[in-house]
Amino acid sequence: MTAATEQKEKTGTDNVGRVVRVTGPVVDVEFPRGSVPELFNALHAEISYKDLAKTLTLEVAQHLGDSLVRCISMQPTDGLVRGVDVTDTGASISVPVGEGVKGHVFNALGACLDDPGYGKDFEKWSIHRKPPAFDELEPRTEMLETGLKVVDLLTPYVRGGKIALFGGAGVGKTVLIQEMINRIARNFGGTSVFAGVGERTREGNDLWVELADANVLKDTALVFGQMDEPPGTRMRVALSALTMAEYFRDEKQQDVLLFIDNIFRFTQAGSEVSTLLGRMPSAVGYQPTLADEMGELQERITSTRGRSITSMQAVYVPADDYTDPAPATTFAHLDATTELSRSVFSKGIFPAVDPLASSSTILDPSVVGDEHYRVAQEVIRILQRYKDLQDIIAILGIDELAEEDKQLVQRARRIERFLSQNMMAAEQFTGQPGSTVPLKETIEAFDKLSKGDFDHLPEQAFFLIGGLEDLQRKAESLGAKMEDTSGDGAPAQSDSKSDSKGDDADKDA
């Protein structure tokens, strides 16, 4: 039996072409006249390489004319030669959906990686789908409470919205995504889908182990197309994960959390594919279709009536340049942005969120309420004034400031440190359990802090703690130690002349 005959039995189609050119992951295939497959159709080629037989999946990317199609391979093309038969499946790439995908790891083609052969009999959906119709969208806006003080107070997340974590290399994007998976799964239940797009394979394995240890793997589906995969796979893996999430939203009427790490790699893979297809590059070398490709993905991530897909996306910022077309294009689709800053990270404040650079569309009295909005704006005002004064402090010293500004600087430094928090995802590194602070307590604590109710407490007491009880406990501990050494019973005060001194004290604490 020939390979073409076997493929005909598998796919039910006799539309068979042959390979005429192979250039890396780009494959040109010639079909009989009048039988050219449609764009995005999946093609299969049976190849043998070093005594190993495998099925190669290609996706039609261009029609070249004269019955020729140009395809992108989803796997390495080692062993693929001219003349090999290629069969049109008559459909696009599809992935398994349903309750059975939870607790397992899949690749972009829907093959189970942790249990080969698992899921072959599941219902399958095409990864290329249209977004919900406008009249099906959910008109209400609701906040998603996370238990992280800096997020809930200053950049509240939208249930059913799109949230991005911006930052350069090594500032904690993946750790924060792992933290959110833990928090959402433990506090709210529901289903999570994780898409690993072009990131480190080691991180994918670590995530798998951590989710299993936290007992949340049973409610999570993972789809990986990591950095060792061809660009075609890295470009499609986000769509595969989104398709699984859409099933839970549309068929099971569930609220779903979709995590994408990293959306920049999706753009990067699209750029590689565009170059391989011979398209003229656009700004900074990116593909001319960047906005369309991003829109096709982001428009499907939305809330329909009574159910939602809430997406959290890590966005790598090349060279910390926010004007780069990749992060700039992502901005247009977002409901909330959380910027992770290297300067905040260097102070040892985790999560390293820059509160002045982060934003949310629902930080509005009509959504979060008057009290939440008022407290958030006062905290932002204090932090912004502190930032404005830092040049003067660096040149002249804090003693040259007016008394009012001195007091504001002291208060701002306490606010900065109180925005830090121990995280569940980092327990194995810090040895400290993660903390969750209810929104009401967060608002109350920062209201008191911004009014000066805690000005007498040492700065170190605010560092890497949870709510008000933790603050009182740590302040009493530090106060007792400092009284014993000073002997005069004076309230504990910290030296604020230098940021570096305060930061060193925080780290020691």
UniProtKB/Swiss-Prot annotation:
UniProt KW keywords: ATP synthesis, ATP-binding, Cell membrane, CF(1), Hydrogen ion transport, Ion transport, Membrane, Nucleotide-binding, Translocase, Transport
Identification of the protein by name: ATP synthase subunit beta
Subcellular location: Cell membrane
Quaternary structure, from the entry: F-type ATPases have 2 components, CF(1) - the catalytic core - and CF(0) - the membrane proton channel. CF(1) has five subunits: alpha(3), beta(3), gamma(1), delta(1), epsilon(1). CF(0) has three main subunits: a(1), b(2) and c(9-12). The alpha and beta chains form an alternating ring which encloses part of the gamma chain. CF(1) is attached to CF(0) by a central stalk formed by the gamma and epsilon chains, while a peripheral stalk is formed by the delta and b chains.
Native source species: Mycobacterium sp. (strain KMS)
SMART domains: AAA
Bias type Basic and acidic residues, positions: 496-509
EC number in record: 7.1.2.2
Enzyme class label: translocase
Gene Ontology, cellular component aspect: plasma membrane; proton-transporting ATP synthase complex
Alphabetized Gene3D superfamilies for the sequence: 2.40.10.170, Bovine Mitochondrial F1-atpase, Atp Synthase Beta Chain, Chain D, domain 3, P-loop containing nucleotide triphosphate hydrolases
One Pfam match: ATP-synt_VA_C
